[in-house]
Amino acid sequence: MDLLEYMRSQNNMTQAEWERTFEEEAREILVLLAGGSGAGKRNGFWDVSHYFIAYVDCQTGALHTGDGRIVYPVSDEEHDAGGILDRFRREAVYRLKARKTIPHEIPEGMTASSQNQFLIVEVLEEDAPCPALEDVLAEYRRPVVVTDEVLGELTLDKDLDMFEGEVLWRGEQICLSLEVDAADEDTWADARRAMKVMLAEQDRWDGDMRASAARELTDLACEWRESADEEVPEITEESFARRIELRSIAMDADGSFSAYFDDDDMFFGHCVTAYGTLTDGVTAANIEG
């Protein structure tokens, strides 16, 4: 089963089917929440997730580190009422009674946290004391800064799994984001290496991204021009490519990238984004924001 088929099968589950993917017997755990949260629509209910970075099995006392999720279902009515992501606080320890997900084969592309989930049965305690998890939290809060000889100083945002910094691009400073797995230093090196490959040929990449965006979006920009309140200059592919201004690049560890350009008000302040990979070149361009 490929990733798309797997996701469709998951989204088609009823609540009863979804709950059967967890062990029948509940266990007591202490869990340290950190990172994001979200909710996904399934078949007749919403699956709410809050991410954790470690938990302790209260029966064995064993500490388990690594990304995971605590999850619970809510109805459409509860979702529409709002506030479903406010139930738990980040960087807090909770004592829970919960059912662990039953291990099963997942396709490539699924995150490790999808196999490390607990369905909440009962919240037993908030801000529960746990020295082991407090140590994990202290380490999590410790800033991680990497200094690269080409990319300069990069600061890790552990919640977003992203290094952030600035780099010189054709004589101008732009923002840089390296999208990584915060727990896997190999991805740190891969993302830095990929970005340096692009930087080494920045003149070619800059031209390719501008040309691709101009081919894809000039006609649309001309349509927007016609709706302007005041007279604006004619837009050609050449002028489009010249007018957009690169503001930031996001690079993945696998060499996939997104480049974000200022639109010079051709789309009334929307962002022009070019996408691609180091292997395939620029593959698409669109407006966002």
What are these regions (language model features)?
Residues 49-80:
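Short, structured beta-strand/loop micro-motifs enriched in basic residues and often containing a Trp
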